[in-house]
Amino acid sequence: MHIKHLNKKLIAAAVVCALLATATQARAPGKNLAAAIDTVAASAVTSGESPGLQVAVFKDGKAVLVKSYGSANLEQHVPVSNESVFRVGSVTKQFTAVALLLLAEEGKLSLQDKLSKYYANFPRADDITLEQMLHHTSGIYNYTSEPNFVNDGMVHRTTDEMVEFIGKLPKTQDFEPGTDWSYSNSAYFILGGVVEKVAGEPLATVFKTRLFVPIGMTHTALDDETELVPGRVRGYSGAAPGKFTNAPFISMSIPGGAGSIRSTAADLAKWNAALFGGKVLKATSLAAMLTPGRLNDGQTAGVAIAKMMSAAGAPGANSKQEYGYALFVSQEDGHRKVSHGGGIYGFSAALSEFPKDRVTVAVLSNAIGKDVGASKIADRIERVAIGLPPKK
């Protein structure tokens, strides 16, 4: 009788121990994953790839790591905190795309509208659709490629003044609309202007009231260089790892809907959770956003992207990348990746979603230049986050 009770107690104890061991094992990968990501991020700053860094990694909707590293201001020796605010460059474009899609859902515009409906005097406006502009297949020349852009970028302009400026450049078109793919900041700046015309409000207000506030992005705004912003980070140009200089000035009226947002890594992770969680757009709109753009001949934009990258000798030229609305869709060793980077004077950013892995990675850097900045650091963090070994 006592032996039976003892056996039952031993069995129960063994079961409890097994459950505790299982629970410990279940928690361990999260802790180990956070430590592994932390090591990658910390070493990037130590090796001089960025003066400062902000990282947010989420898995299954929960934070694995939200942490900041290094310096927000090299001259003042101010450390980066999780509330420090970085410019995110072209990550802005997906917000512009979503604003257009929301207006389309409300029947206030169509993505098949010709640009001439909103900017009648812009060159070739009768031949270009809003959707082609979203896909970078409009052929509109990229104004940031202008040789004098550094000087042009110092001048504050209204949206209409900027659209007029783009339309009067010596070159306005790279190719016939719909026949090729070429990244165009001009197209997305103009799309920001379309949002303003249709919504009847400044782009900053549209973003704030329809996107940032509802999602709880408390440290995010369309940037204004004259505004005093708590936690604003100083940006740097990098000639090489560890060799930084203060970045050139740019009026944030110049990037507009193509690249003017400031944010934090944690806020961008919130954005991805809301966007891919179906809380921002209708399912059909989100699906359209992720659908590869097509050229007039029926080929996807990815064919043209591959040719362009190959001709430029760019890394990853042999990997298939497609482009939807302000999002690249690709594969990372069999893992579907939806992403966009950003680069603007002094800053670089990378925001990625791995839908099947349920992993979000946001990396913000206050550096841009050769072998510095967010891109390569984010690549390494992403591979750790989705369980892949480092690239050789």
Task: Please give the residue ranges for each predicted region.
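Bacterial N-terminal signal peptides that target proteins for export
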Residues: 2-12
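Catalytic loop of the DD-peptidase/beta-lactamase superfamily, centered on the K-T-G motif
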Residues: 3, 26-67, 199-201, 205-209, ...
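Bacterial N-terminal signal peptides
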Residues: 12-21
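Amphipathic, well-packed alpha-helical segments that form the structural scaffold of globular domains
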Residues: 42, 62, 163-171, 192, ...
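Short, glycine-/polar-rich solvent-exposed loops and beta-turns at beta-strand/coil boundaries
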Residues: 49, 224-229
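Alpha-helical scaffold elements that line and support the substrate/ligand-binding pocket
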Residues: 55-57, 61-62, 87-110, 114, ...
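Secretory-pathway/luminal and periplasmic proteins that interact with or process carbohydrate-rich
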Residues: 64-66, 122-129, 139-146, 214-224, ...
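Active-site-proximal loop and beta-strand segments within enzyme catalytic domains
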Residues: 71-185, 199-201, 227-248
